[in-house]
């Protein structure tokens, strides 16, 4: 089906990806298409709060959570590649635990929908609302690309949207626990990710 307007979105074969940081995108998607599949990349390294948020979101919204896990558990990866790969080669850890599992999951779909926003970081400043994802070879839709932090907060307040409690502890961008810290004062919201490393993206949004 086409992707022009809500009717097109209701019929197009797409999946929503969520980090379970907040449920704004999920709230929007569930209203347009009840029962929409939502991918959550369960890396094995998440904060307990993130897993709790995922479970709460799944019980509150009319969605179908696809809990996607990597080929190997953390313990298996430690045995195969040595302990704490994230500390030695974060790029490879993200590839194995996020990018590859998502790639496999997306094979059955014609588009994926993300909560990517231009205001999150310089690396995302040119994010299109609709584009073609060269990495995963399918249409990528970022319906919130132009939203500001204020827009997100207003929507959360207005619609009583579920939020990961870590947000209120000062974490503005939440990923795997070992690679997530609170952002630096005055820096962009994603500055707490991979602090001290020359890395700003996990690779899911590389293209």
Residue ranges: model-predicted function:
Residues 1-207:
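Nucleotide-activated chemistry modules centered on ATP-dependent adenylation/adenylyltransferase
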């Amino acid at each position: 089906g086409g992707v022009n307007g809500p009717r097109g979105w209701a019929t197009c074969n797409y999946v929503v990806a969520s980090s379970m940081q907040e449920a704004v995108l999920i709230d929007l998607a569930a209203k347009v298409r009840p029962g929409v599949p939502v991918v959550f990349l369960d890396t094995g390294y998440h904060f307990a709060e993130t897993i709790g948020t995922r479970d709460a979101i799944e019980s509150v919204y009319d969605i179908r959570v696809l809990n996607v896990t990597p080929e190997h558990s953390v313990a298996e990866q430690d045995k195969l590649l040595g302990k704490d790969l994230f500390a030695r080669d974060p790029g490879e850890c993200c590839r194995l635990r996020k990018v590859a599992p998502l790639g496999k999951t997306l094979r059955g779909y014609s588009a994926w929908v993300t909560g990517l926003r231009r205001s999150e970081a310089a690396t995302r400043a040119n994010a299109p609302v609709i584009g073609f994802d060269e990495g995963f070879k399918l249409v990528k839709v970022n319906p919130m690309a132009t939203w500001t932090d204020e827009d997100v907060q207003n929507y959360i307040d207005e619609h009583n949207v579920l939020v990961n409690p870590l947000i209120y502890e000062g974490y503005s961008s939440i990923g795997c626990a070992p690679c997530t810290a609170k952002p630096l004062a005055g820096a962009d919201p994603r500055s707490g990710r991979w602090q001290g490393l020359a890395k700003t993206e996990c690779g899911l949004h590389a293209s």
